[in-house]
Each structure stands twice: as C-alpha cells, then as structure tokens.
Amino acid sequence: MARYLGPKLKLSRREGTDLFLKSGVRAIDTKCKIEQAPGQHGARKPRLSDYGVQLREKQKVRRIYGVLERQFRNYYKEAARLKGNTGENLLALLEGRLDNVVYRMGFGATRAEARQLVSHKAIMVPGRVVNIASYQVSPNDVVSIREKAKKQSRVKAALELAEQREKPTWLEVDAGKMEGTFKRKPERSDLSADINEHLIVELYSK
C-alpha cells in the first residue's frame, strides 16, 4: 500500500479527530469541520459495527504514526511476542521509531517532516548517521542533528514550535546543541488517552 500524499486534513476528518499531521501547536480549529467526513458537504457517517470501530481505531493510530499497513501488522506481531500488555507494547514500539523520536524531540514540526530529516541523512544515533525511519531507538541513545543540517530553517522553526508543546518526560533535549537523549521507553500513562489500543488488539486477535 502506497503512502498517502493527499491533504492531511482529509485524513483527520475521516477519523473524526486531530491526527496532528500538520505543524502547529493548536488542535485543528472547529472551522475545519473535524466532525464531518471528507467531501464538500461532509458525508453522513454511518453507525459502525464493533469491527468497524476497531478498524477505525487501527487506521487512526496507523495514520498518526505514518506507518503502512504491513508495517503496522508486523509491529503488532512483535508486540504480541513481547512480555507484558500487547497494546502497550505496540504503542512503545511505535514511539520508539526514529522518525517519531525526532518529532517528539522537536527537531521536526510533524512526523512527516521528521521522517524526511531521517531519510535525508540529517540524523545521527548515537554518533553515526541513520537514515531508516523505522530504526528502533534504545534507552539512553543520543539522537542528534548532523552539523551541516543544524542551519536548516525548518529545524529551527520546529524547535520554536516544540517550546510551546508539552515536553515528553521520557526524553531529555538540549535545543542549543540540537540533540536529545531517549531516557526510557514511554509508559502508557505518558501517552495520549485518546488512543484505545485495546480495540486494535481485539481486531488482530480475531
């Protein structure tokens, strides 16, 4: 399945919630009709079955993290093999992706921009260039911007935006040096309550 390249707002309207796919710190304004489905007049949303609700939750989380269907399923399989709660393991794996860590540290205004920084070889972990967005960052890894990329205006703009967002407690960032430490994997209480990972587990358990 190809990566979606269309309007980001359309995806948020499809899921009925802000997926944080656009830069900025404010949630999508109500003028954007987030509660309406895509289309000029906003198609009426049908009442979903249990399966439909589970599927929509999976699609929502997949789109938040910018992961393709096959990748997402593989993350679920890995999460199920690990000890502990499968749903929480899944979220921890998604949060541990390098593109997500770069975004969380404030080096990219969106996860898509962070993914681009990674693919353009602007990111080092720890001290060597890594250009694989799905690379799993380990506790105590230092993630930094390459010297030649530090002057990029988009990185500076992203860091300014990040100052207005709540800072993740599992990360330690030195904005001046443009580097950060992945102190630990996030716990479920650290992450958004708007995600219902139990629905995803139910979907894949069938």
From Swiss-Prot:
The keyword Kinase does not apply. The keyword Cell membrane does not apply. Gene3D superfamilies: Ribosomal Protein S4 Delta 41, Chain A, domain 1 (1.10.1050.10), RNA-binding S4 domain (3.10.290.10). Residues 96-156 form the S4 RNA-binding domain. InterPro entries: Ribosomal_uS4 (IPR022801), Ribosomal_uS4_bac-type (IPR005709), Ribosomal_uS4_CS (IPR018079), Ribosomal_uS4_N (IPR001912), S4_RNA-bd (IPR002942), S4_RNA-bd_sf (IPR036986). Pfam families: Ribosomal_S4, S4. One of its GO terms (biological process) is ribosomal small subunit biogenesis. Keywords: Ribonucleoprotein, Ribosomal protein, RNA-binding, rRNA-binding. GO terms for molecular function: rRNA binding; structural constituent of ribosome. GO terms for cellular component: small ribosomal subunit. One of the primary rRNA binding proteins, it binds directly to 16S rRNA where it nucleates assembly of the body of the 30S subunit. With S5 and S12 plays an important role in translational accuracy. Part of the 30S ribosomal subunit. Contacts protein S5. The interaction surface between S4 and S5 is involved in control of translational fidelity. Belongs to the universal ribosomal protein uS4 family. HAMAP family: Ribosomal_uS4_B. This is Small ribosomal subunit protein uS4. The gene is rpsD.
